[in-house]
């Protein structure tokens, strides 16, 4: 027990050593986040009100003297004080002595160690010492408190190592509750401004269960007539009236009219009014927005959800979908999640602060940038989470290790997926959702291993048979051909480019449906989806495309392969290391050839995407850029003619040029970029000359009208053309 001194009217106590050290740390160190003091004190007031409400359930007489529950703020600029008053359970003399100074809370030392280790001051409430945050802005604190079991007492301290307690007869009596009077430091007067106090209550305590009111100045203008304000002038006017009345008796009708007009003017003058300003004070409730997540979903209207969403997000549009739920049992929390109508333009900006989910603990705002609360792929979801189990003011340092938060996160993801599935039942709404947030779903496929199969059910793609409609993987599988083994897909830059790809020729001929994957993120997502409902996904631009063939077809193809073997070798010799090998294939019907990639390497589209990455790892790029495989169509007339010419003369320059031209063209039709566009252009020009029967060695004739290069430019004349 700390030492105690008595004076005739008050008792002086020394702070416990740990508390004294904590106060010294708060007063002498610099903290930028001082505004949290109000959150802590309002939270303490709310706790005190919860306690008396609980006591009143057992014994209604506890609230006979003061049946109202309230928290009130009063800023006194004249005395530089901020008062926070509540009608909670109040404190006895013993409570004031023990709770506010002589008995250290178990968390006092732990909080000091956390502060010295660099933690945020906003953690103070987590350790049960939130009251002392008052000294962040005040150099003296006065606590007036009245408990039903004791008289009214006042506690006071300037945090100078001691505090005083005495029976209170100098302050306005409390029926029950506590009144904190903060004597603000000279540089903290911003907390006397109505605007600032409203801002802090809205930010941190808007959803406290009890009404929070602020004493505000109200200016009212009233109209006062001049005759009320200036009685002397009125008397003078009356005397003038009397004199004129005596003269009126002898005047003509015309003069009577003149006098009447004069009287009207005079009457108007008499009734002339002016405005007087009166300043009054009244209580303005600050937390009018009730926490609708505390109500049952069946009790909340669509209009209330829309109003709350706009207030929460400052969005000018209504939300697209909402999920309102609560989790009870070993863990309790309530949540309200919204899907907006459109994605923010900077949704995937890496440096953007994620602040879409606001975290509350027992209606007290904690933070709005808790990245551990929801995965990145769901960062577009907006809403609130209110936990009954998390410690108040949980720190960022302990978030990642907090098991409660991990359970909340898991439930939020589950409920989001339920919400998205509900949206699929509304075709137009889901179409809007998918247009805006399909990239997020695909990012979820890439990142969320636990929910990958559920997210895959939400994916939609255009196909060779769907026209402009989007098709789900389930719909695709349900209408697969009986002899079809795989889910076929093709990746590319656009629907137009993939729709005319040579890789689709045989698949279309067999009436197999192919998925178009034209979003760059599709390349990453599809690598994680190995199969769907037991059907493996197969890229039709990579080697290993297996198609069911009859025995006769197989024998016929084997004969063609053997026949084309010399041409394959010759093409490989010409192209050298540009291709890994040259093979005969069955995937083409109309095209002579194309370039395929290895099954585990990058596709042409992925290669294009990765080359566009400015900060890519070049070592990985070279590893994944596996050699291309040239696959030729042995049934195509070009290949047959080329085989015949190569057989006649392997040194034929035209054959060599044609091989290179086929390779370059195959690069383009297969989705790759040209390695040497200039060489490709030269080959095209030679083919044009050949088609025009021009000599390949022919040079452009000299133009005699062209001045020599060594002549001055000014001497040359340009012919004028009309």
From Swiss-Prot:
Q: Which SUPFAM superfamilies match?
A: ATPase domain of HSP90 chaperone/DNA topoisomerase II/histidine kinase, HSP90 C-terminal domain, Ribosomal protein S5 domain 2-like
> Per its UniProt record, what InterPro entries does this chain match?
HATPase_C_sf, Heat_shock_protein_90_CS, HSP90_C, Hsp90_fam, Hsp90_N, Ribosomal_Su5_D2-typ_SF
Keyword check for Cytoplasm: yes
Provide the Gene Ontology terms for cellular component: cytoplasm
* Short motif (TPR repeat-binding): ranges: 718-722
CDD domains associated with the record: HATPase_Hsp90-like (cd16927)
Give the comment on domains: The TPR repeat-binding motif mediates interaction with TPR repeat-containing proteins.
Q: How does it assemble?
A: Homodimer.
PANTHER family the UniProt entry points to: HEAT SHOCK PROTEIN 90 FAMILY MEMBER
Q: What is this protein called?
A: Heat shock protein 90
Q: Which organism is it from?
A: Theileria annulata
């Amino acid at each position: 027990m700390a030492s105690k001194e008595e004076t005739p009217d008050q008792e002086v106590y020394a702070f416990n050593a740990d508390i004294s050290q904590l106060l010294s740390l708060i007063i002498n160190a610099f903290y930028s986040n001082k505004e949290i003091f109000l959150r802590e004190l309002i939270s303490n007031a709310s706790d005190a009100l919860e306690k008396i409400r609980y006591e009143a359930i057992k014994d209604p007489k506890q609230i006979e003297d003061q049946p109202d529950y309230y928290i009130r703020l009063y800023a006194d600029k004249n005395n530089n004080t901020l008062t926070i008053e509540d009608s909670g359970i109040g404190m006895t003399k013993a409570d004031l002595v023990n709770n506010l100074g002589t008995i250290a809370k178990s968390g006092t030392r732990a909080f000091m160690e956390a502060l010295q280790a660099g933690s945020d001051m906003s953690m103070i409430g987590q350790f049960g010492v939130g009251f002392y945050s008052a000294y962040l802005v005040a150099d003296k604190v006065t606590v007036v408190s009245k408990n039903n079991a004791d008289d009214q007492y006042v506690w006071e301290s300037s945090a100078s190592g001691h505090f005083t307690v005495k029976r209170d007869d100098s302050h306005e009596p409390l029926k029950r509750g506590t009144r904190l009077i903060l004597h603000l430091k000279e540089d903290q007067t911003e907390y006397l401004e109505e605007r600032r106090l409203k801002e802090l209550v809205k930010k941190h305590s808007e959803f406290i269960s009890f009404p929070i009111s602020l004493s505000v100045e109200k200016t009212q203008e009233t109209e006062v007539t001049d005759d009320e304000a200036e009685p002397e002038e009125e008397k003078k006017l009356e005397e003038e009236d009397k004199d004129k009345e005596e003269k009126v008796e002898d005047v003509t009708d015309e003069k009577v009219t003149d006098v009447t007009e004069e009287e009207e003017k005079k009457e108007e003058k008499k009734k002339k009014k002016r405005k007087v300003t009166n300043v009054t004070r009244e209580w303005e409730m600050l937390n009018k927005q009730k926490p609708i997540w505390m109500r049952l979903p069946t009790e909340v209207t669509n209009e209330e959800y829309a109003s709350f969403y706009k207030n929460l997000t400052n969005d000018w549009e209504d939300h697209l979908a909402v999920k309102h739920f609560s989790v009870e049992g070993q863990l309790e929390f309530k949540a309200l999640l919204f899907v907006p109508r459109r994605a923010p333009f900077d949704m995937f900006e890496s440096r953007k602060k994620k602040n879409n989910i606001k975290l509350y603990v027992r209606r007290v705002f904690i933070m709005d940038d808790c990245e551990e609360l929801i995965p990145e792929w769901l960062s577009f979801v907006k809403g609130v989470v209110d936990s009954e189990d998390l410690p108040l003011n949980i720190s960022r340092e302990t978030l990642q290790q907090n098991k409660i938060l991990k359970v909340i996160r898991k439930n939020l993801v589950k409920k989001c997926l339920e919400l998205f599935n509900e949206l699929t039942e509304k075709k137009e709404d889901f179409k809007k959702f998918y247009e805006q947030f399909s990239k997020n779903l695909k990012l979820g496929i890439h990142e969320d291993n636990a929910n990958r199969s559920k997210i895959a059910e939400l994916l939609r793609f255009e196909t060779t048979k769907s026209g402009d409609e989007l098709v789900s993987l389930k719909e695709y599988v349900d209408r697969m051909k009986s002899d079809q083994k795989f889910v076929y897909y093709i990746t590319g830059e656009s629907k137009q480019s993939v729709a005319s790809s040579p890789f689709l020729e045989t698949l279309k001929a067999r009436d197999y449906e192919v998925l178009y994957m034209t979003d760059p993120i599709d390349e990453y997502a599809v690598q994680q989806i190995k199969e769907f409902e037991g059907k493996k996904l197969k890229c039709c631009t990579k080697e290993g495309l297996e198609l069911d063939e009859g025995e006769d077809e197989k024998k016929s193809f084997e004969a063609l392969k053997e026949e084309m073997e010399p041409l394959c070798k010759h093409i490989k010799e010409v192209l050298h290391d540009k291709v890994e090998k040259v093979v005969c294939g069955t995937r083409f019907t109309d095209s002579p050839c194309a370039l395929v990639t290895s099954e585990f390497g990058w596709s042409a589209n992925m290669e294009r995407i990765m080359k566009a990455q400015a900060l890519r790892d070049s070592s990985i790029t070279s590893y994944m850029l596996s050699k291309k495989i040239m696959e030729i169509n042995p049934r195509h007339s070009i290949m047959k003619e080329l085989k015949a010419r190569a057989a006649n003369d392997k040194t034929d320059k035209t054959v060599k040029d044609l091989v290179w031209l086929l390779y370059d063209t195959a690069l383009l039709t297969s989705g790759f970029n040209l390695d040497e566009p200039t060489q490709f252009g030269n080959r095209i020009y030679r083919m044009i000359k050949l088609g025009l029967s021009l000599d390949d060695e022919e040079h452009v004739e000299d133009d005699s009208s062209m001045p020599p290069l060594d002549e001055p430019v000014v001497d040359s004349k340009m012919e004028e053309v009309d």
